[in-house]
Amino acid sequence: MKNLKFLILLLTFYSLQSGAQNLRVKIFSESQFNSLSTEAIHGNYQIHSPSGYIAEYKEGQSLHLQLNTSKKLHLTKNGEFLGLFDTLFILQSNHQDYLKIKPEGKVTIKPRQYEGDFEVTANQRGIQLLNLVFTESYLEGVLRSEAGTRCAKEYYKVQAIISRTFAKNNVDKHEKDGFFLCDAVHCQAYYGRYNGESKAINEGVKDTYGLVLVDSAGKSFPTFFSANCGGQSAETDQIWNVSLPNYVSRPDTFCIHTRQANWEQYIAKKEFLEYLSKNFFFDLNDEFLVYKALNFEQKQRKTFFIDPSLGIPLRDIRAAFNLRSTFFSCEPVGEKILLKGKGFGHGIGLCQEGAMEMVDQGKTYNEILKFYFKGSKLSTSAFPINHW
C-alpha cells in the first residue's frame, strides 16, 4: 500500500505538470529476464524507491539492474553500487526525455527506446518493467509498431483513432496485475517510442488528438483490427465466442489484391487427421468424413470445420497449426494437405491493408472509419485522470 500511495503521488504531480495522463504499460511483456541495462539517451532522470530519492541519472550515464538470489534489485550506476531494492522508479525531467533499455535473458532481446517514467519491480518470475507514458506518446509507439513507418498520414489518422479507442476500452484489462495494458498484440503492439522516422505518424496522432469512436448512445465503440481480412470480415462469435451486433460479416474488396491477401501452408495428412481424432473424436474410419476433411471448401467465412454438428471450431485449427487465419480451404497433395488461405489475422473490424488501399484511392479517414465500423461516430473523450 505504501508503494502504491507513493507512486500515485508522483504520477499526480507529473500529470498535473503536463496536463496529460499516464498509462501504465508493461513492456517486454513476452520475455522473462533477471537483469537489464539502460542508458539515458536524451535528458536527465531521477531514481527513487518507495522510501525516497536515490540518485540523479544524467544523459549518457548507464544503469544496470540484476535480480539477486534474494529476489532484490541490485542497482549500479556507471558501475557504482547504489543499493538493493524491491521497487524502483526512474522519472524523467521532461516529456521529451527517453531511455534505451536492454533486458538480458536466456533469449537475445533487442534494445528499445522509450519515453516516460518507469517502474521496475522484482518478483518470483524475474523483473517486471512498466512504462508510465502519456497516452498520445503511447499511440505514436503503437502506430509505429502496428503499422510501420511507411503509411500515409490519412491512414495513421485512422489507426490513431481506433487504437486510442481500443486503449480507452481496455484500460483495465490488466488491472489485477497492477498495470493498464501490456505491449503484446492482444493489447496492442508497443515496441518503443516514435523516433521521428515518419513525420506522418506524429501528425496522424496530433491531428486526431482526443478523438475516439462511440456508438449512437455515446458509449465507447469496441474497435478491433487485423492485417488483412481476406476479402470478407469475420464476426466476433466466429473468433471469440462473443457476439457484438455491430460486427456483421461483409465483403471487403479493398484488400483482395494486397500483399497478405493469400497464403498457403502444407500439413502432413497423418498429423492433421490425428489432431482431429484426438481433440474432437473425429472418426478416422468414416471414409466420407475423411474425404470431407481433406477437401474442405470455404468460399465464404465459416465458423466450424466441415459442419457445425461436428463441433470443430476453425479458430482451434488455426491455433493448433499456427495458421495465418481461419479463412482457408483444403486439398490433398500426396501425403500432405495443402491449405489455401485468405487474409492474415482474426479479420474483425478494420482491415489494415484494406484501409491503406482506401487511402490510396483518395478516401478520407472518416469515410474509412464509417466503412469498417458501422454505427460509429467520432467524439472527443479523455481518459479518466485517476483510473484507480
Give the location of each predicted region.
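N-terminal secretion targeting segments of exported proteins
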Residues: 2-3, 20
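Conserved, single-site charged/polar hotspot
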Residues: 18-388
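Sec-dependent N-terminal signal peptides
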Residues: 4-14
